[in-house]
Amino acid sequence: MRSSQTLSKYIDKATDQFNLEPNLALNIEIADLINEKKGNTPREAALLILKRVNSANPTVSYLALHLLDICVKNCGYPFHFQIASEEFLNGFVSRFPNHPISRMNKIQSKMLEMLEEWNYMLCKNNRHREDFSRIHDIRELMAFRGYKFPAVDEDSIAVMKPNNSLRSAQELAREDLEAHKAKLQELLRRGTPMDLAEANALMKVIAGYDEENTEDYSALAAADLESIRSKALRVKQFLVNQTVSLEEGTLADAVESLKVYQTKIARILREENEDEYYVQKLLSLNDLLINVIEECSNSDLIHSGTNVVSSQPNVVESHVPPSSNDTKQESSLIDLMKLTEEPAVPSPSLPTNVPANQSLSMLSSLSNSMSSTSNGALNSPSYSQAAIPNTNSSLTSILQSDSLMISTQLTSVQKSSGFASYSVQFSNCSLTWPVSEVVFQVAVVKSLKLQLLPHTGDAIIAPGKQNAAHEIMNITNIPADASDLRIRWRVQWIIGTDHRVEQGESHLPL
C-alpha cells in the first residue's frame, strides 16, 4: 500500500502543471521504482500515467508523455505488457477522432511518434512480440483511417535496440521466467475463461511440465554464437575483398561491434562453469574475435583508430586455460600501460589480481552489462592524468567525462601491515542515455598485490544516477613509508551504442 502511495505521489510530482520542463531525474526514479517493486506496480504505474496523459491540461499531458517514454525505455517486459493491453491502448488513443483532422496538436503528434516507436521495437524487434500484437493492431487501424505516422528516430529508440545482444542460456531463461510471471499475474487478474485457460497453459510451461512449448535456451544461445562467428568471418573476408558487404556499414563499426561481443563473452566465461561444450564454443569464438580484431588493427583500411581497435584481454576464471592469443593480447596491453619513473599528478582507480613475476601486474577486465542508446563512430582513447576534484571531499574523481565518472574513496588503511582498501564508485553523468558494458583495467608495480571483490550495484547505470555501482579494492604489500599508490588504468564503456575509451595515470591517496 505504501509503495502505491509513493508511486502515485512521484507521478503527480513529475507531471505537475507548474513544472517548466520534464524532471528527468524523477522520471528515472519512477522507472527504477517500477522495476524494483514489480508485482502489480507496472499496471498501477501505466494507468496512473495514462490518466495524466488524458488530462485536460496540455502541460500535464506533455509531461506525462515524457514520463511514459522514459518508463517504456527503461522498464522491461512487465511494463511493456501493460502498455500493450486493450485497456491501456484504448485510453491512449481516445484523444484521436475516427478520422484525422487537418492539423495535429503537439500532444497528438508526440503520441503518434511514440506509438510508431512501440510498434517498431516491441512488435518487430522483440523476442516476445506476440504478446504486444495489440500495439501493431491499433497502429494499423489508425493508419487505415488516415493517420500518418512519423519515421522512427534511430537515436530515440537506440536504448531499446537489441544490437550486439549476446546472452547465455541462463540469462535467456531468467528473462523468459520474468516475462511469464508478469503475464501470468495479469491473466489471473483478468480472470475471464479464456485468460484462465491461457494461464493454466502458462503455469505448465513455468513448472517445466510442458516441454513441447518450452524454449531450448541452449540452442538459442548457440545460435547467437554462430551468428557472431559469421559476422567475424565476414569482417575477415572484407580485409581480403572489399566488395564483401558488412552489416554495420563500415569496417570501424564492424570491429567495434566485435569488441562489444568479446567483452560480453568475457563476462559469460566468468559466470559459466557448468556446460563445458558451451564454454569451449565461447573460447573458440573468443580466439576468432581476437584474431580478427588484431588483423583489423594491422590493416591499412583503418588509419587512425588502431589503439581502440586493438583487442581486449580475454578474462576467464582459473579453470579455463588461456589461449596463446590471450597471452599476446595481455602483453600488448601491459606494454601500453607500462609504469615509468616519471612523477604523476594524484588521481585514483580500479584493479584486479596481480602476479609478482612481472614489472607490471596483469590486466584483468571488469565488465558490467548495460543497455544501449545512440549511434556513434569509433572513439580514439584520450589520456587523462590530473584528478578532478569531486563535490564530496572524501571522494577523488579519476575520470569525469560527459557520460561516466569514476571516483575512489579510501575506506581502510593499516600502514603497519601494508594494507589499504578502496571503494571505487561509478556514476552516469549523462542525463539522456544509460551507461553499459563498463570494462575497467588497472596496472600496478610488481611489488603490490591487489584483490577486487565482486561487483555490487547497478549493472546498467541509469541517466544521471550517482554512485550506482561499486567495487571494493584491497591492496597489500604497501611500503610503510608510502604516501600514495601509483597506478595506470584504462576504461571503456558504452553510452548508448557509442563506444568510449579513456586511459590515464593516477595516485591513490593513503
From Swiss-Prot:
It comes from Schizosaccharomyces pombe (strain 972 / ATCC 24843). One of its GO terms (biological process) is protein transport to vacuole involved in ubiquitin-dependent protein catabolic process via the multivesicular body sorting pathway. It comes from the Eukaryota. May play a role in the regulation of membrane traffic through the trans-Golgi network. Its main location: Golgi. PROSITE patterns: GAE, GAT, VHS. Residues 391-510 form the GAE domain. Pfam families: Alpha_adaptinC2, VHS. The keyword Protein transport applies. One of its GO terms (molecular function) is phosphatidylinositol binding. Keywords: Golgi apparatus, Protein transport, Transport. GO terms for cellular component: cytosol; Golgi apparatus; nucleus; trans-Golgi network. This is Probable ADP-ribosylation factor-binding protein C1F3.05. Residues 177-301 form the GAT domain. It is found in: Golgi apparatus, trans-Golgi network. The keyword Transport applies. Residues 14-150 form the VHS domain.
